[in-house]
Amino acid sequence: MGSVARIMTRFLFSVVNSAVSWDSEVFLSDDSLCEIEFWSNNVHVLNGKIYWGASSLPVRVSCFSDASDSACGAFVESQPELTFHQNWSLAESVRSSTWRELKAVCLALEAFASRLSNSKVFWYSDNQNVECILRNGSRKCDLQELALVVFQICLLHCISLEVKWIPRDLNVSADCISKLVDFDDYGLNDIVFQGLNHLWGPHTIDRFSCSYNAKLPRFNSRFFQPGCEAVDAFAQYWGYDNNWLCPPVCLIVRVIKHMELCRAQGTLVLPLWKSAFFWNVCARDGVHWNSFVVDWVYLPKFQGLFVPGKARNSLFGSRPIDFDVVALRVNFRRPRPPSSLAGFCSMPDGKCYLCS
């Protein structure tokens, strides 16, 4: 049983070491009880078998991962579209390099798991401790917990994992991914979202988010993330859903054009920047919302309107906002009559000489 026996007896081994003698009573921790339960349920299946390093699975895949002090990244060599990236929080960024490298394996493996099912996976890392811990476990609880997560993912998805160390100069691609910083790592305040969801929902999918800031169970992400339904929202058809859209500012025009292409509906959050490049796409005359906007509201202006993600110095959320933010109800299926201007004026008083 190789690595399985070593990894799944670490906490029990600690319990044995704590005994004064073989006849003394010991305290069984929750982790050690979980290991006992695991062996009770699986010893008859695993006994006499080499599970972790099995070579009988026909599909063989190579994965590479790395972690920097700001983020982590990974990719599947034969499937370049399977690329994972996630920022570190401040607390995560100060953890040991081994913890970050091991966490990167956990997160990436979880993100890729459904695509790697029933495969023999060779996982390459430039941290030698990762190879050792995933073979033998660790005496450090935080590292052992991560090793167990990796093992459980493999068990659930029938993945045979073999971890190998490679020199840093052979892991350049994963290293580059891990050094990306997503400055659009923010989301809308949960209470404000719930209000909009009650007003125009229920929304069915969050098109621009990640595993730790998604507002809905279904979400799209820029990179593969644990739980994401699809990567690249613009490669998806939006016409069947009530879309929740809080995109990076640089993508607002593309969002509107894609909604038009799909004849989609949804709620779009954007800053009220009348000098911005996207403004004429939203308000052709510079004042009144275009006919695809069927309703709209100002969002309350307070410091917590946008919630920062894990990245430091994100565009919104890391400092107080001094501008208005609006939520537009967009409907390309049933736009309002273009001549209907009353109530759709973006002037401070809510009206101008054309619509008063």
What is each model feature region?
Residues M8, L12, F64-D66, A74, ...:
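Mobile genetic element proteins and their domesticated derivatives, centered on retroelements
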Residues L109-S173:
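RNase H catalytic domain
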Residues S78-K103, A111, Q128-E145:
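A short, polar/acidic, helix/strand-boundary loop motif
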Residues M1, C158-W200:
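C-terminal functional segments of enzyme domains
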Residues M1-A54:
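C-terminal reverse transcriptase regions that engage the nucleic-acid substrate
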Residues T204-S356:
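Class I S-adenosyl-L-methionine-dependent methyltransferase catalytic core
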Residues G48-P58, S114, E229-W238, K257:
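A short acidic-Thr-Gly-centered motif at the start of a beta-strand
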Residues S56-S70, V105, D206-C210:
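Two-metal-ion RNase H-like nuclease active-site motif
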